[in-house]
Amino acid sequence: MRVLGLISGTSADGIDVAIAEIQGFQADLSVALLAFETIAYEPSLRDRILEVAAGFPLSVAELTALDAAIAQAFATAAQTLIQQHGAVDLIGSHGQTVYHQPLQAGQLGWSVQLGWGAAIAQQTGITTVSNFRSADLALGGQGAPPVPAVDLWLLGSDSENRCVQNIGGIGNLTWLPRRDHPDWQSEVRGWDTGPGNSLLDLAVQKLSQGRLSYDDGSQWAATGQIDQVLCDRWLQEDDYFRLPPPKSTGRERYGWQFLETWAAELDRLTAADQLATLTEFTAASIVNNYRHFLPALPDRVLVCGGGLHNQFLLQRLQQQLPTVKIASTDDFGVNSQAKEAIAIAVLAYWRQHNVPGNLPAVTGASGPALLGDVFART
């Protein structure tokens, strides 16, 4: 089946669009990437998304208008790749996350992904699966991260323990134990590790007065000096790093509010030192999760997402994990930039074939769930 996957991460850089040929379901799952592109949002739409994600209040009318605008952008992105690479049988659309509130104090969590699935189905004329998080949330799960079940079948190993580390706006991991004993599937874990590119990108925007949206090649951060005392304070005073999994987070915690809370301390540093320290914090937050909550350090970390292009961040990860091999998912057959969109395509394919897409041991849900609402074309 040819399936098109759509997703935009918390950084809202653009819409990742992947077309994949998918066969099989779990142990026999086969995915061949046929096309991939990231299509940028119109600047005004991206600004609106980031405002909402930062807590800017909207009326119901404004929120629904934004939902429709994002759906239009997603549908147009899908049509662009279909025109270039041929028809597809199914679309999976994760949408644009603007708020995520996981389970707290026994109350069900909730998560808002904009990008109206029914509108995508009608505009493209293709059955569309969207709203992938709600079924897991309704079962008391975190609803995130949504991809570990896909990682399990595409990136596991018979000979080594692996972590798949996505570094998007937020970081998330999938722990994949060696597949050489009967219970390995039940030991797969996954959760959000904390900040990915979010704090760095926002700091670059602020320090450049809006001229830059990110630190290309981490050249700016690499010239700075790390304030280890400040970095250690962030790790020690943030209770998210003491919270055991299953857990999930978002820009609500690691966005503008974080930078504003620590503005006095950051402003005492040069711009380069701020970026170097935020880079160290991002790397340390990932390693903190490994050391505190994994059964053992992985033999290999497979990195994907935009953070793979941040060489300074990868150097800091390697410095803090000297015995661990760090590679890219590209090296093991899964395109590192398309991986999240591929995973959404697989989740949609599973939903269409009534295959559960969550892992209760990962999210904390009370049972397996069919992920996504199906909107048939008319």
From Swiss-Prot:
GO MF terms listed in the record are:
ATP binding; kinase activity; phosphotransferase activity, alcohol group as acceptor
Give the domain of life.
Bacteria
The question of whether ATP-binding is a record keyword is answered with yes
Range of residues in the leader sequence: none
Check the record and name the CDD domains matching this protein.
Answer: ASKHA_NBD_ANMK (cd24050)
Pfam families given in the database record: AnmK
Which InterPro entries does this UniProt record tie to the protein?
Anhydro_N_Ac-Mur_kinase, ATPase_NBD
* GO biological process per UniProt: 1,6-anhydro-N-acetyl-beta-muramic acid catabolic process; amino sugar metabolic process; peptidoglycan turnover
Q: Which UniProt keywords apply?
A: ATP-binding, Carbohydrate metabolism, Kinase, Nucleotide-binding, Transferase
Describe the family membership recorded for this protein in Swiss-Prot or TrEMBL: Belongs to the anhydro-N-acetylmuramic acid kinase family.
Q: What protein is this chain from?
A: Anhydro-N-acetylmuramic acid kinase
